[in-house]
């Protein structure tokens, strides 16, 4: 079995939380794992909003906190509270992909800030400003 793809989520609002939930409930989760979340909100709020969702109900697994980590079924997810992509050391996190869910970054120069900070690949959860701002649309 190959190593799971290590994913970080940047922006943990509605879209970031739905992405984590969908991945957690998917049979693909043995191939894809969230190892980091970057979100300015307080860690306690992140845990609470993960556990209780007004649309989707309770999270289907145990949600807890340990230090600066969110634990989902005992699996640790590192949490940072940076407000700019270059403030996160993506390379040190050992991630393979950042899923950009904040909606704040939509132009090529803005997105290249992630790459310059050590992010090997970036997937947007929202449309880029133009086709010229991204390498591919999936």
Region annotations inferred by a language model:
Residues 2-138:
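N-terminal Rossmann-like NAD(P) cofactor-binding subdomain of oxidoreductases
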């Amino acid at each position: 079995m190959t190593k799971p793809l290590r994913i970080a989520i940047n922006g943990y609002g509605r879209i970031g939380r739905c992405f984590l939930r969908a991945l957690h409930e998917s049979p693909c989760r043995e191939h894809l794992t969230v190892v980091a979340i970057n979100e300015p909100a307080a860690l306690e709020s992140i845990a609470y909003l993960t556990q209780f969702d007004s649309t989707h109900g309770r999270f289907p697994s145990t949600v807890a906190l340990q230090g600066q980590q969110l634990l989902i079924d005992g699996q640790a997810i590192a949490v940072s509270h940076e407000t700019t992509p270059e403030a996160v050391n993506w390379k040190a996190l050992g991630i393979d992909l950042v899923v950009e869910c904040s909606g704040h970054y939509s132009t090529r120069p803005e997105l290249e800030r992630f790459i310059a900070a050590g992010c090997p690949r970036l997937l947007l959860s929202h449309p880029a400003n133009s086709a010229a701002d991204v390498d591919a649309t999936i």
